[in-house]
Amino acid sequence: MTTQPEASLTVTRRYVLIGTTALIAVLAAGGVGFWNSPDTAAAQSGPSGEVSMADLLVPSPLGDEIQGQADAPVTIVEYASMTCPHCSHFHETTYPEMKKKYVDTGKVRFIFREFPLDPLALAASMLARCAGKDRYFPLIDAFFAQQKDWVVQKPLQPMFAIAKQAGFTQQTFDQCLANHQMEQGLVDERTRAQQKFNVNSTPTFFINGKTFRGTLTPEELDKQIAPYLKG
């Protein structure tokens, strides 16, 4: 695998679960500056372990966001933070090819799970969830594609501009960011991923249970998927 840095977990649960009113206040005051900058680490050149597929496929507290057929021979689970630049890179480069070549042809089932590293990532994940099933992945794609526009010191206005394209009004935007149940569900899944599957950086992928930390190129993904498609 090509060596690339990845965003590492540097924040504690008490900072992630900051409360719904406080979340909006933090974003209004400057959502990025509130956090320590993430450390960087080299991506690994191969699988770094393996987890139980039975455990991995237990849905997240809010339910999983899935693309592809349930009987696909390969299941890929990605844990990503919406503010992670290497997650954005994967979704702008490898993901479109993966979806066209493997997901849309019934070879891969793709499960995307949120692993927010900061309040801004948490807010973007909440907005994608609030958008609904049909608009979830398009809004995820939009946030990744325009990451440089909204991962800024004053993020609320550019975030709303993106969310507005998915049908949000100012009222529904504010209501979403004040949804404590959704916030708690995302935080609970982040905690489960960390404790159960040793996810401590983003992006982290599980390909049929094998763990890969760091972004994957299309060629690297082809290499890892190929053995499961033989015969």
Describe every region a protein language model picked out:
Residues 70, 103-105, 198-200:
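Extracellular/periplasmic catalytic domains that process cell-envelope and extracellular macromolecules
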Residues 2-46, 164-231:
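C-terminal cap of thioredoxin/glutaredoxin-like
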Residues 78-81, 199:
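Processing junctions and N-termini across compartments
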Residues 46-58:
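N-terminal low-complexity, Pro/Thr/Ser-rich intrinsically disordered segments
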Residues 76, 84, 173:
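Residue-level signature of catalytic and energy-coupling elements of molecular machines
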Residues 57-74:
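A short beta-strand-turn-helix
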Residues 80-83, 88-164:
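Structural alpha/beta surface segment adjacent to cysteine/selenocysteine redox centers
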